[in-house]
Amino acid sequence: MKTLLTIFVLALGAVSAWANNGVVGFWTTIDDETKEAKSVVQIYEYKGKIYGRVVDVLKNKNATAKLPGSPKIIGLDIIWNLEKDGDEYNDGEILDPQKGKVYGCSIWREGENLIVRGKIAFFGRNQTWLPNKTFKGDGKPPIPNIPKH
């Protein structure tokens, strides 16, 4: 009985460690210039691919994207079609809503943080997104709605 309990506790710890290394969840983005928290993005899985949707903008809740129709940034998918590749998710795209430009995208975990890389060919840059443990969604993963760009 003691051995069975030990195996159960070890297995539970392994599953918990694996779950904490995932990318799915809520993440706080940081403004490159001011270094202040900017928005909350929900990273979610849909049909085996990873997507990211802005669920909150921390300063200007009515901010719009530089896209046809000027959609609000809140509710906008900014990451789409990422595929798992080892410990990373690659071959997707990311939208910069303020510029209306789309770049290649990869994401991966470094410790508790999420590293988001936007790139054109071999050139790119990384952003570090912080885990957001206070934002509560409705519990249902969204259905992707990739913006026209």
Model segments located where?
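Positively charged n-region of N-terminal signal peptides that target proteins for export
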Residues: 1-5
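Cleavable N-terminal signal peptides
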Residues: 6-7, 17
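Sec/Tat signal peptide C-region and signal peptidase I cleavage site
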Residues: 13-20
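K/E-rich alpha-helical interaction surfaces of small helical-bundle regulatory domains
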Residues: 21-38, 127-134
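Central antiparallel beta-sheet cores of small beta-barrel/beta-sandwich binding domains
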Residues: 28-103
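A short, sequence-level motif marking secondary-structure junctions
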Residues: 45, 58, 108-111, 130-135
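Surface-exposed interaction patches
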Residues: 90-93, 99-119, 124-128
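Edge beta-strand at a domain terminus
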Residues: 120-149
